[in-house]
């Protein structure tokens, strides 16, 4: 199953919500046609995060006896934050959420893959493998991208 899975902005932190609005292109240029053509606000994406999490939990809880794969755009863990960005708490809230508890409570999730970051990650949270293998911007960065990466779900 999958969804965009916007982040929770550091657990809905007011300072993060305010700061990312001015720092991210998503909130300067994007319009939300559902609300009458206006700029997208961090509060909008936090609400979409909540909706996606509710959907994920519903589907996962209905399928406890099946192996599941989750695909989301934004990262489910701060473990997917590259070392050079770890000190930027506010901006990291716009890229990563801490969904470790949700993942640990649902061991049927065998693989969770995501994007939104420009560096590769492959690690475990409990019984769940978290994988991100982005190419990044062509000719601009060394992301660790593996064009032949295959992930086997057991």
Show the residue positions of the predicted features.
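Binuclear metal-dependent phosphoesterase catalytic core
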Residues: 82, 87, 91-110, 118-154
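Hydrophobic/aromatic beta-strand patches that form the interior of the parallel beta-sheet core
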Residues: 1, 69, 111-113, 131
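Active-site metal-binding loops of divalent metal-dependent hydrolases
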Residues: 3-5, 74, 115-118, 135-137
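Active-site-proximal loop/helix segment associated with metal-binding centers of metalloenzymes
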Residues: 1-69, 74-86
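Bulky hydrophobic/aromatic packing residues
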Residues: 6-9, 55, 95, 112, ...
């Amino acid at each position: 199953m999958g969804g965009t899975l916007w982040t929770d902005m550091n657990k809905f932190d007011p300072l993060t919500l305010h700061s990312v609005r001015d720092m991210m292109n998503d909130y300067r240029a994007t319009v939300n046609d559902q609300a009458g053509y206006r700029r997208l606000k961090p509060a909008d994406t936090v609400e979409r995060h909540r909706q996606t999490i509710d959907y994920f939990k519903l589907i996962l809880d209905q399928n406890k006896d099946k192996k599941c794969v989750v695909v989301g755009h934004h990262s489910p863990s701060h473990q997917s934050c590259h070392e050079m960005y770890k000190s930027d708490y506010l901006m990291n809230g716009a890229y990563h959420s801490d969904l470790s508890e949700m993942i640990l409570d649902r061991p049927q999730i065998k693989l969770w893959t995501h994007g939104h970051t420009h560096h590769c990650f492959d690690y475990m949270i409990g019984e769940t493998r978290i994988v991100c293998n982005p190419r990044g911007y062509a000719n601009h960065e060394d992301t660790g991208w593996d064009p032949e990466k295959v992930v086997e779900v057991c």
